[in-house]
A protein has these predicted regions:
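Conserved GNAT-fold acetyl-CoA-binding loop/helix
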Residues: 27-54, 65
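Conserved GNAT acetyl-CoA-binding A-motif
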Residues: 110-112, 133, 139-152
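Glycine-rich acetyl-CoA-binding "A-motif" of GNAT/NAT acetyltransferases
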Residues: 74-77, 155
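Conserved N-terminal entry element of GNAT/NAT acetyltransferase domains
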Residues: 1-16, 24, 28-36, 191-193
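A short helix-loop-beta-strand connector motif used in the catalytic cores of GNAT acetyltransferases and
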Residues: 53-68, 84-89, 113
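C-terminal "cap" of GNAT-fold acetyltransferases
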Residues: 143-154, 161-163, 170-193
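Conserved acetyl-CoA-binding loop-helix of GNAT-fold acetyltransferases
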Residues: 119, 125-138, 158-162
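Conserved acyl-donor/pantetheine-binding loop and adjacent beta-alpha core of acyl/acetyltransferases
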Residues: 80-116
Length: 193
């Protein structure tokens, strides 16, 4: 059914696509985070900063942790996941907006954490997200799998729920702007395979 979808390990040359897809997966949150670095002269634009971050060799959540889905001759989606080790306990949030997510992550040390799973809008609904999710579950190598999504992201909540993920905890999101829509961050987990 999804034989038209090919998965491959990302390479450094995919950094631009990874930045775009990570931003899509985060519904613009990644761009907001990268904006501060652009304002400080690290890059000209937030997207350029995202590309630089995704091209780093040693950074968790960069190209080395990413799997690309291709369909119909183009990059269609990405999943970025890694083992969440004890080192997360030493990380402190540097801005209030990341504190709730970091606190949730600290409760699932030892799991395989999916930091991003995104598919271009015109290619959604044909199994690409499911295929990327299945691949991440396989990469977990019998560890529990965890992820965080927004409480108002119904498509993501549905996909994860249909694939054995259960809500483990919630934390109110810190609004990015005064008029931002209110939501919570939802930690979802799936038992070890």
């Amino acid at each position: 059914m999804t034989s038209f979808i090919a998965l491959r390990q990302a390479s450094r040359r995919d950094a631009s696509e990874l930045a775009i897809l990570a931003d899509i997966a985060s519904r613009g949150f990644a761009t907001w985070l990268w904006f501060a670095d652009a304002e400080n002269g690290v890059s000209d634009t937030p997207l350029e900063r995202g590309r630089l971050k995704m091209s780093e060799d040693e950074a968790v959540g960069s190209w080395r942790n990413a799997v690309i889905a291709e369909a119909y001759g183009e990059v269609a989606g990405v999943a970025i996941g890694h083992a969440l080790d004890e080192g997360i306990g030493d990380i402190e949030a540097t801005i209030p907006t990341t504190a709730p997510m970091l606190a949730l992550q600290k409760t699932v040390v030892g799991s395989w954490f999916i930091g991003s799973l995104g598919v271009y809008r015109h290619l959604r609904g044909i199994g690409i997200g499911r295929r990327l999710l299945d691949d991440q579950i396989e990469r977990a190598d019998r560890r529990p799998v965890s992820l965080i999504t927004a409480s108002d992201n119904e498509a993501a909540l549905s996909l994860y729920g249909k694939n054995g993920f259960l809500e483990a905890a919630r934390a109110d999101a810190v609004p990015l702007f005064e008029n931002s829509k209110r939501h919570a961050w939802v930690l979802m987990t799936r038992s070890a395979a």
